[in-house]
């Protein structure tokens, strides 16, 4: 694709999609493998290299200590996970990951000890890459599970999230593009199987939803046109996943919260805020929201009741004096309207339901109070009295 689509390729290169998965080598591995150690729940694990291989000595099947080779990386920032091959074509996800934000090893939650016979233990089904993770980190992923032998022969076209993940199979498009320009037939969508432009907002959002949603899958994604529900079953707004007002509780991957929002109902789509190839925000700070919302009305102290960056004021500090939020943070739209939660340790995920803070309701139903996320020295009564 790069031969013709240079700009799109350059934007994609180095993105979270590009770095979704890779073969472990000196370029792709971020973690410290210079005899680094971490002790969790009385078990000391060691990361090291030998004969060019990345190895970890830790507790494995049945809790027995052993040496395991790491063959693949998974993700990049703010954390990187690592995959270990097991018999039956399985790749298993280590419970120890690299915090690429603070450069340290840590244990991926849950923080409490997990027994070797628990479904969540890292050598068991919950941490199996083939069945739980692979479909959204590689392109044209075919699990190829054999129920008779309880084994996998998993394949992919691209190890990461590549062009065909969104655009669909591209061979016919390449054949069309390689014809002399005057000899190209008039074909639908340049002979690409899946349409990515000229869509309505629902169709556009559902291009992203297969991976950016909490859902079950009824088969492998063939990256071809069709309704989201042809293959996927998005999770409902259940009490184990969302707070009673719809705020995110568990890791739900955006779609379920965004489709609750007024933004979604008014045809806002993912690409209004995210550049589709780099996945970066199209603008920084409040400028992102001011693409649609009038700055004279909303980017003002009269609206958000906070000091702007550069104005005199006192930052919010912790009990031991650490600065938690500098002056001006409260003037950012996302602080009040997209409060988030941390998942998998250091991974902060903003809530995409775009709510108006309601401290009284939050106190009544036990949902997070957007004000108290920053104002850690205050209480719910203060929040309710402060909302005008």
Task: Locate the predicted segments by residue.
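Local sequence-structure signature of Cys/Sec-based thiol-disulfide redox active-site neighborhoods
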Residues: 2-6
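Primarily the internal scaffold of c-type cytochrome electron-transfer domains
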Residues: 7-75, 81-87, 93-95, 103, ...
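An exposed acidic His-Trp-rich patch
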Residues: 122-125
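Function-dense linear segments that define catalytic or interfacial modules
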Residues: 128-135
